[in-house]
């Protein structure tokens, strides 16, 4: 009986080393319920005015918009969500997915404002208005949503400082299936541009843009919510989607190499054998 532990250890050492040589991997693949009849696209305004904030160290409009987009995506776990940016045009950044890791990574690392920091502080030049919400007409025209998505939601995260929208926007959003549209506005009259650390005198928020945003929303049959009403916007999105058919979508989890752990485990019986030999 005393030889049994020795025999077991002699068998375990080559077995564990052989297993380690096979480089085993633990694959944490999971499945998630995904709606087959619904999709959403989140469009974030990346015009320079989205850098405005309440102070030099306060969060910018874009930072708050990214956070709100993350909150809204997590509130719709079964809805595939795509991401795009808006300035003079609309540019997709991520295809619709229910994998929150993808949307979180794109929101954190990819969506920003080009030319955010000028080479020298602007003191006399009034920023040019470049944002055009009329560019949203490309969403229904360019088939952002597949035919299978009968429930379509567009959420636009913007400060509403936009050029007037032309008739093309209204025509585009008359297509069927209809695209439900929510505008989530990030704006305050006291905000300024602090890109260089001091307020740029060339930029002062204009309250008149609120009416222009309301006009654009009316043209597409949408609704406008302020960032303080994020919960109301979330409820509106949830009510719009309701319930529907789903399918199980597999998602690859983290792949963990087990070779180091198996190799380490092989040293346990080996250490036992060395200990017995020295007795």
How should each PLM-predicted stretch be described?
Residues 205, 235-250:
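A conserved amphipathic helix/loop scaffold
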Residues 79, 179, 221-224:
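Short glycine/serine/threonine/alanine-rich loop segments
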Residues 1-32, 243-279:
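C-terminal signal-anchor/stop-transfer transmembrane helix together with its immediate cytosolic
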Residues 23-150:
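Membrane-embedded segments
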Residues 51-54, 91-94, 162-167, 191-194, ...:
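Extracytoplasmic/secreted cell-surface and envelope-processing proteins
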Residues 124-128, 134-135, 142, 160-215, ...:
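VWA/integrin I-like adhesion module and closely mimicked acidic/polar interface patches used
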């Amino acid at each position: 009986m005393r030889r049994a532990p020795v025999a077991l250890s002699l068998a375990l050492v080559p077995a564990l080393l052989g297993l380690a040589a096979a480089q085993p991997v633990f694959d944490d693949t999971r499945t998630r319920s995904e709606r087959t009849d619904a999709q959403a696209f989140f469009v974030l305004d990346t015009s320079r005015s989205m850098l405005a904030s309440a102070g030099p160290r306060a969060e910018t409009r874009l930072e708050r918009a990214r956070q709100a987009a993350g909150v809204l995506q997590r509130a719709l776990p079964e809805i595939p969500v795509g991401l795009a940016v808006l300035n003079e045009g609309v540019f997709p950044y991520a295809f619709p997915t229910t994998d929150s890791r993808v949307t979180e990574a794109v929101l954190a690392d990819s969506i920003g404002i080009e030319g955010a920091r000028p080479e020298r502080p602007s003191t006399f030049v009034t920023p040019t208005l470049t944002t055009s919400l009329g560019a949203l007409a490309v969403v229904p025209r360019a088939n952002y949503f597949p035919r299978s998505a009968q429930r379509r939601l567009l959420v636009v995260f913007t400060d509403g400082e936009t050029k007037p929208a032309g008739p093309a926007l209204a025509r585009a959003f008359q297509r069927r299936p209809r695209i439900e549209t929510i505008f989530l506005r990030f704006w305050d009259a006291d905000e300024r541009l602090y890109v260089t650390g001091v307020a740029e005198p060339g930029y002062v928020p204009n309250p008149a843009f609120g009416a222009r945003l309301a006009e654009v929303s009316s043209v597409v049959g949408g609704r406008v919510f302020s960032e303080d009403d994020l919960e109301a916007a979330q409820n509106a999105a949830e009510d719009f989607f309701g319930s529907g058919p789903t399918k199980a979508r597999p998602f690859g989890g983290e792949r963990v190499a087990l070779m180091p752990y198996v190799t380490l485990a092989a040293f346990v019986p080996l250490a036992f054998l060395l200990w017995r030999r020295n007795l």
